[in-house]
């Protein structure tokens, strides 16, 4: 079931280690989406507004939307949509142009409560290594980001491609970095 299901048959099934662990990861992901500075600012606003109150997840998310101006409707699916998202990753290296195309597909298999699922926002920390284990500086095509050894990919659709330039040999991907 989801972290915050719409209904449940037994309250003891609601408070499981999975719910707590997934809930913690969702909050960590929110801090990455919002950015550390805005995250801490939003948490302070949250306590100013709701200290001592019984609140809902909707209250929590609304504070972040209000304080950052970001629409978090799709992010809210992490609280309400059940199931386990699966990812398929493929790469195409173009040695002529020293480019790597990384393709990621998201699958959200049907569950007993919903046959059709919406894509979830997913963050993937990526690095690329050569065959000696040396990290490539990552430079994304059409991006103003400075080159770094690790890149945070924000996926918000079912299928997304990322192109990295200045890659002179087929790399080994290092996905899901902490």
Annotate each predicted stretch with a short phrase.
Residues 31-36:
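Acidic, glycine-rich low-complexity/disordered segments
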Residues 3-6, 18, 23-26, 37-40, ...:
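Non-catalytic accessory/interaction domains
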Residues 8-13, 43-46:
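Glycine- and acidic
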């Amino acid at each position: 079931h989801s972290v915050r299901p719409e209904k449940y048959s037994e309250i003891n099934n609601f408070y499981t280690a999975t719910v707590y662990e997934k809930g913690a990861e969702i909050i960590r992901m929110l801090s990455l989406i919002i950015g550390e500075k805005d995250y801490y600012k939003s948490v302070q606003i949250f306590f100013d507004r709701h200290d001592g109150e019984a609140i809902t997840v909707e209250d929590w998310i609304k504070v972040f939307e209000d304080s950052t101006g970001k629409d978090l409707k799709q992010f809210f699916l992490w609280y309400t949509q059940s199931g386990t998202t699966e990812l398929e990753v493929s790469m195409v290296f173009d040695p002529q142009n020293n480019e790597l195309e990384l393709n990621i597909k998201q699958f959200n298999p049907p569950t007993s409560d919903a046959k059709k699922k919406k894509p979830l926002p997913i963050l993937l920390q990526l690095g690329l290594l050569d065959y000696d284990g040396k990290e490539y500086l990552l430079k994304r095509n059409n991006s103003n980001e400075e080159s770094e050894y690790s890149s945070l990919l924000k996926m918000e659709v079912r299928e997304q491609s990322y192109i990295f330039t200045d890659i002179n040999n087929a790399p080994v991907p290092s996905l899901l970095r902490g």
